[in-house]
């Protein structure tokens, strides 16, 4: 029994997956989008909704939530079907269509598959502390959903990469006290961000605690009141008053069932033809961060371009006897009866 029938099944509802809906719609192809998360947006919305993005054409700066909202609005005329909280588990190839089965038993029939799953399913790298689960989503968070929620609070950021440094700069604007704890004296972040952190440290807006690491969380009922940190050189410990802790140690990605679909994979990325984004499997494409080829740039705008290339190639697969006369969107507008 088939629950949904579509032209293209898009695996992943991040920015590139949503833009794929628009590109397909401009060619009068319907999309059904499958994503494991409970809302569209992928990592862009789940991890960085208020983090500024500077390399989207036409936007001097835009945050993750604003970008996803704009992409969603842009794709709405094409009435995509979103299947959220669903993992595409198995695919069955019937020569001219696929059946895609999700972990909850939903079956989607699709002529073509486009994988736009970013880094795949992902989760945070946790601190090795026994009781950290007691505090997660209460006073320990792995993303900043809304900066204003942390106004006038004592905040600790643990980590030394770009995410830790970027959010230290952003949260210093609203925090009562902000600690940045790192096991090394040097931060692995953009030079300009490192300079900003240094200036904020000198002005007292940020207290940089190095070379230390988080040792213990203290509180009750999931609410922190202090964090004990330990010097990794002389083993000295100190307790710092903390309301919220943000461990920024990156995420662990897992392609999950996609690894079993027969595509060529290298370093957890799917190898594709650079001109069409076609994988080694007929009628299965990959775009965005999950796709790779010589010279690939892992940028959102690169994924947008790949979505357009894939959809134009797919048109000839779905409509082999119907020529595609290329037109700019300014000429043809939004197709009707999509």
UniProtKB/Swiss-Prot annotation:
Q: Which reaction does it catalyse?
A: 2 reduced [2Fe-2S]-[ferredoxin] + NADP(+) + H(+) = 2 oxidized [2Fe-2S]-[ferredoxin] + NADPH
Residues bound to FAD are 35, 43, 48, 88, 122, 289, 330
Looking up InterPro entries in the UniProt record yields:
FAD/NAD-bd_sf, FAD/NAD-binding_dom, Fd--NADP_Rdtase_type_2, Ferredoxin-NADP_redctase_2
Q: What is the top-level taxon of the source organism?
A: Bacteria
Quote any Pfam family the record assigns.
Pyr_redox_2
Which GO MF terms does the UniProt record name? Answer: ferredoxin-NADP+ reductase activity; flavin adenine dinucleotide binding; NADP binding
**Keywords, comma-separated and alphabetical:** FAD, Flavoprotein, NADP, Oxidoreductase
Q: How is the cofactor bound?
A: Binds 1 FAD per subunit.
User: Is Protein biosynthesis tagged as a keyword?
Assistant: no
Q: Which cofactor does it need?
A: FAD
Q: What Gene3D superfamilies does the entry give?
A: FAD/NAD(P)-binding domain (3.50.50.60)
Q: EC number(s) on record?
A: 1.18.1.2
Quaternary data: Homodimer.
The family annotation for this protein states:
Belongs to the ferredoxin--NADP reductase type 2 family.
Task: State the name under which the record lists this protein.
Answer: Ferredoxin--NADP reductase
């Amino acid at each position: 029994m088939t629950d949904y029938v579509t032209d293209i099944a898009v695996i992943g509802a991040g920015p590139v997956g949503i833009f794929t809906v628009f590109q397909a719609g401009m060619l009068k192809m319907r999309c059904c989008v499958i994503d494991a998360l409970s809302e569209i947006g992928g990592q862009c919305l789940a991890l960085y909704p208020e983090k500024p993005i500077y390399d989207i054409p036409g936007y001097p700066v835009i945050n993750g939530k604003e970008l996803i909202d704009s992409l969603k609005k842009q794709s709405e005329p094409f009435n995509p079907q979103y299947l959220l909280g669903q993992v595409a588990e198995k695919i069955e190839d019937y020569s001219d269509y696929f059946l895609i089965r999700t972990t909850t038993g939903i079956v989607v029939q699709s002529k073509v598959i486009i994988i736009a799953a970013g880094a795949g399913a992902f989760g945070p790298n946790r601190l090795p502390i026994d009781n950290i689960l007691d505090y997660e989503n209460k006073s320990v968070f792995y993303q900043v959903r809304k900066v204003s929620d942390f106004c006038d609070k004592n905040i600790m950021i643990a980590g030394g990469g770009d995410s830790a440094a970027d959010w230290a700069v952003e949260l210093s604007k609203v925090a009562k006290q902000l600690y940045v704890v790192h096991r090394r004296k040097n931060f692995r972040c953009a030079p300009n961000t490192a300079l900003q952190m240094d200036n904020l440290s000198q002005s007292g807006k940020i207290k940089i605690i190095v070379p230390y690491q988080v040792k213990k969380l203290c509180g009750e009922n999931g609410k922190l009141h202090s964090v004990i940190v330990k010097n990794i050189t002389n083993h000295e410990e100190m307790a710092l008053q903390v309301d919220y802790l943000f461990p920024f140690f990156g995420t662990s990605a897992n392609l999950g069932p996609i690894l079993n679909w027969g595509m060529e994979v290298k370093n957890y990325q799917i190898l594709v033809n650079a001109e069409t984004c076609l994988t080694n499997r007929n009628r299965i494409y990959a775009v965005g961060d999950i796709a790779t080829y010589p010279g690939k740039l892992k940028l959102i705008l690169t994924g947008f371009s790949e979505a357009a290339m894939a959809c134009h190639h797919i048109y000839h697969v779905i409509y082999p006897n119907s020529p595609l006369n290329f037109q700019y969107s300014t000429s043809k507008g939004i197709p009707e009866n999509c």
